[in-house]
């Protein structure tokens, strides 16, 4: 299922590229004119268990949780469709249980590939608790064409790629672009074989990320195999 593949992508990036992903998403948010409540802390201390063992939610898993250096917690939750009241109440109850378990402030960031104009952004849990995540990042709000052009220029000029460049190559197909996502993925895979200045960690993350994005957006098996072969990093 597409949702499961997108979910796996976000969780994997959160686990193996945590601080870079966190900083990248914060940088995306700053590109808009919207005013957001600042996060109390932006430095990750360690990964926290995603499993909640409680009488109400025994064995249920959150997508990803970080313990921050100020002892607060960042909770990532990903949804592939338009956000619904059910999505928000589900996430809000996770936060309530996580706060009960840790006794610490919980700040939730929802990442959505849905339509921001057709999504709910707050909900009531019960009759007295209004729930609004501190961040809802709708990837479709952010323009991707210029980002792709910028990374392409760096690759063609044999420039060293940053962590943000690597994440751009993975996330651009989910952003707002003038062409469809399948065409964007194919173009990106054509570029990456030309990359030479890249670290071992970046190579692993990019290879893994493109493996999933090609599977998400390319439906024809023969085309998928061809594109994956084309995207082999040197």
Q: Model-derived features: where do they sit?
A:
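Elongated, amphipathic alpha-helical interaction scaffolds
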Residues: 1-234
């Amino acid at each position: 299922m597409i949702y499961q593949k997108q979910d796996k992508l976000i969780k994997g990036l959160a686990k193996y590229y945590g601080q870079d992903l966190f900083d990248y998403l914060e940088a995306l948010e700053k590109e808009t004119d919207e005013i957001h409540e600042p996060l109390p802390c932006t430095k990750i201390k360690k990964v926290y268990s995603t499993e909640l063992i409680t009488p109400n939610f025994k064995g249920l898993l959150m997508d990803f949780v970080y313990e921050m250096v100020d002892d607060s917690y960042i909770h990532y939750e990903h949804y592939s469709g338009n956000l619904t009241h059910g999505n928000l109440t589900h996430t809000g109850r996770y936060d309530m249980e996580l706060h009960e378990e840790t006794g610490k402030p919980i700040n939730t960031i929802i990442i959505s590939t849905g339509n921001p104009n057709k999504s709910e952004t707050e909900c009531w849990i019960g009759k007295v608790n209004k729930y609004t995540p501190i961040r809802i990042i709708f990837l479709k709000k952010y323009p991707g064409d210029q980002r792709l052009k910028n990374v392409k220029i760096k690759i063609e000029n044999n420039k060293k790629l940053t962590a943000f460049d690597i994440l751009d190559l993975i996330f651009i197909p989910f952003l707002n672009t003038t062409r469809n996502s399948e065409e964007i993925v194919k173009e990106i895979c054509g570029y990456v074989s030309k990359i030479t200045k890249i670290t071992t960690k970046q190579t692993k993350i990019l290879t893994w990320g493109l493996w999933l994005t090609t599977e998400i957006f390319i439906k024809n098996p023969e085309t998928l195999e061809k594109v994956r072969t084309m995207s082999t990093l040197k």
